[in-house]
């Protein structure tokens, strides 16, 4: 029954009762005609008043009923009665929001990722030794496209699983990219002084290598970092900050890392032999505070690495260690067994808008005879450095950066490669949305000493758009 019908019925009942209660006394009384008329007038006035109150209540209920449907929640529905099509507005049902819930018992779960797109023009990647027989063409490049998830458990475990759509691990041809894992690890952190990390991640060697891709001041890492550092490996490490609880104000004073890894690269579950790669790193932050009212710090670091590898192992993950006949560089896949030892030192000083970063790396690659089989290559020593500086011309928005780098592969006489890079970074929304542009000039000592192979100086421009989510 509608509201209108319900209240009309109530009004009729009230009128009837009022008439009965009014007429009966009038019939029984012997009062004058004027008294009877006065009583009737009062009864009519009372009925009119009650009728007005009931109408007001009906109107109030109607307005509430209409207001219960939110604005903009109507949709047009077309019906057919057999003769014509009729359009009418009907209330649109509210949709239940869609959400994702973890299947496990994680107390924290975060989904994120980032995309880096490059435009590369000129002598593309010449600073990495890609010229001559390994030269690349001008290109647009999806440099990285990663998606990952991190989480925490109440039982003092945290984890990360991340993959990249732009890697070429095992793809054919090698220029083809595919999706593969980057960081896949589990970390036990009950004691900040002694945490255990297990899985695939960057072995703790090299400051520039360990700096996140999204926070680098220069678009690409230096040639030295690519040639010597082991990048991502599968293994386990013990790491921590010894002063976290005993000296909380100086918890970052010292950080240590010590790990054991397969040593033959990422996304490879089989070890190349029964030996492992041993990696260690120490970081010291003797100062963290303010200088001239500016947030500042000084961080010092040192690394060491040792690995015994078998034939077929790629000891240069970035593909820029083996010196070709024309002085260009490519991946160094061992023709025989080796033992390699590397070390490095680094420093990072920040004073407000100014950063100064320096790093030196050195690696000894010595052949091993296994089961009477010679290594098939001569021993060599590779070394190099990078010095990087940045300054915010507009605080937190517009930054100028410069880098000087050098790599001595050490396999042919006078085979060093130098590069100087100048760049500008525009932080539209911090590192979440950033534009970068670099100009790189490169010299090849080998090409200069052997002009028959062609040019010995190279130029490149790289632009990048970065989005994090």
Language-model regions, residue ranges each:
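Bacterial N-terminal signal peptides that target proteins for export
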Residues: 2-13
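Low-complexity, intrinsically disordered short segments enriched for Gly/Pro and polybasic residues
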Residues: 10, 24-25, 74, 78, ...
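C-terminal segment of classical bacterial N-terminal signal peptides
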Residues: 17-26
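N-terminal periplasmic/intermembrane-space "pro-region" immediately following the signal or transit peptide
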Residues: 26-116, 123-128, 248-251, 469
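Acidic-residue sensor for enzyme active/binding pockets
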Residues: 33, 41, 53, 57, ...
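A general secondary-structure boundary signal
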Residues: 37-41, 47-61, 65, 114-116, ...
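Outer membrane beta-barrel
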Residues: 96-306, 380-410, 415-420, 444
């Amino acid at each position: 029954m509608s509201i209108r019908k319900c209240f009309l019925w109530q009004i009729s009942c009230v009128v009837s009762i009022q008439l009965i209660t009014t007429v009966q006394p009038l019939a029984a009384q012997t009062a004058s005609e004027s008294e009877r008329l006065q009583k009737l007038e009062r009864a009519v006035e009372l009925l009119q008043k009650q009728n007005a109150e009931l109408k007001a209540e009906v109107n109030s209920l109607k307005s509430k009923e209409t207001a219960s449907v939110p604005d903009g929640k109507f949709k047009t529905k077309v019906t057919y009665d057999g003769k014509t099509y009729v359009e009418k507005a009907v209330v649109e049902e509210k949709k239940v929001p869609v959400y994702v819930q973890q299947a496990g018992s994680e107390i924290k779960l975060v989904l994120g990722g980032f995309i880096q797109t490059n435009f590369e023009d000129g002598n593309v990647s010449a600073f990495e030794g890609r010229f001559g027989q390994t030269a690349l063409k001008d290109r647009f490049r999806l440099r990285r496209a990663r998606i990952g998830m991190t989480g925490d458990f109440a039982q003092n475990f945290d984890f990360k699983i991340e993959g990249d759509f732009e890697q070429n691990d095992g793809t054919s041809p090698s220029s083809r990219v595919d999706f593969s894992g980057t960081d896949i690890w589990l970390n036990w952190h009950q004691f900040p002084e002694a945490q255990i990390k297990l899985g695939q991640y960057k072995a703790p060697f090299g400051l520039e290598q360990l700096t996140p891709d999204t926070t680098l001041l220069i678009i690409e890492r230096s040639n030295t970092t690519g040639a010597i550092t082991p990048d991502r490996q599968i293994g386990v490490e013990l790491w921590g900050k010894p002063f976290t609880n005993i000296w909380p104000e100086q918890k970052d004073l010292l950080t240590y890392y010590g790990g054991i890894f397969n040593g033959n690269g990422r996304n490879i579950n089989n070890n190349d032999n029964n030996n492992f790669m041993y990696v260690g790193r120490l970081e010291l932050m003797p100062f963290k505070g303010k200088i001239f009212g500016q947030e500042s710090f000084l961080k010092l670091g040192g690394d060491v690495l040792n690995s015994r590898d078998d034939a077929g192992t790629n000891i240069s993950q970035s593909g820029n260690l083996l010196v070709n006949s024309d002085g260009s560089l490519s991946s160094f896949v061992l023709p025989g067994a080796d033992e390699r030892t590397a070390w490095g030192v680094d420093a990072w000083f920040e004073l407000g808008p100014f950063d100064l970063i320096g790093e030196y790396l050195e690696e000894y690659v010595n052949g091993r005879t296994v089961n009477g089989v010679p290594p098939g290559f001569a021993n060599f020593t590779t070394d190099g450095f990078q010095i990087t500086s940045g300054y915010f011309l507009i605080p937190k928005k517009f930054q100028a950066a410069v880098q000087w780098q050098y790599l001595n592969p050490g396999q042919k006489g006078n085979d060093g490669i130098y590069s100087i890079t100048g760049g500008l970074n525009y932080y539209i929304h911090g590192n979440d949305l950033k534009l970068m542009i670099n100009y790189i000039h490169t010299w090849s000592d080998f090409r200069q000493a052997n002009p028959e192979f062609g040019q010995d100086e190279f130029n490149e421009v790289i632009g990048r758009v970065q989005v994090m989510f």
